[in-house]
From Swiss-Prot:
Major place of residence: cytoplasm
Family in the record: Belongs to the GroES chaperonin family.
GO molecular function, one term: protein folding chaperone
Record's function text: Together with the chaperonin GroEL, plays an essential role in assisting protein folding. The GroEL-GroES system forms a nano-cage that allows encapsulation of the non-native substrate proteins and provides a physical environment optimized to promote and accelerate protein folding. GroES binds to the apical surface of the GroEL ring, thereby capping the opening of the GroEL channel.
Gene: groES
Keywords noted in UniProt: Chaperone, Cytoplasm
Organism: Stenotrophomonas maltophilia (strain K279a)
Cross-referenced CDD domains: cpn10
Keyword Chaperone in record: yes
Protein name listed in UniProt: Co-chaperonin GroES
Pfam families listed in its UniProt record: Cpn10
NCBIfam families linked: PRK00364.1-2, PRK00364.2-2, PRK00364.2-4
Length: 95
């Protein structure tokens, strides 16, 4: 993947939902919801502040995150879909 996010943006590779439910039912692709979990694969240099400084990003490559379902923009590279999000669109870091 050759994408470098700018400013306070991060690139997230969505983590696909399970193919089988907890009860053992196979979930067809048409019934799956869009993933809202993913792994950070690239991080921008940080958010430029009004005073000229740059606020360092709080996320790092490898973090597993939860983000809003409709947040960011989709980007496809080599058959893999990624989301480009603002750091503010990330709701939480998972364990």
């Amino acid at each position: 993947m050759s994408i470098k996010p700018l400013h306070d943006r991060v690139v997230v590779k969505p983590i696909e939902a399970d193919e089988i439910s907890a009860g053992g039912i196979v979930i067809p692709d048409s019934a799956k919801e869009k993933s809202t979990k993913g792994e950070v694969v690239a991080v921008g240099p940080g958010k430029p502040l009004d005073n000229g400084n740059v606020r360092a990003p709080s996320l790092k490559v490898g973090d597993k995150v939860i983000y809003g379902q409709y947040a960011g923009s989709s980007y496809k590279s080599e058959g893999v879909e990624y989301k480009v999000l603002r750091e503010d669109d990330v709701l939480a870091v998972i364990g």
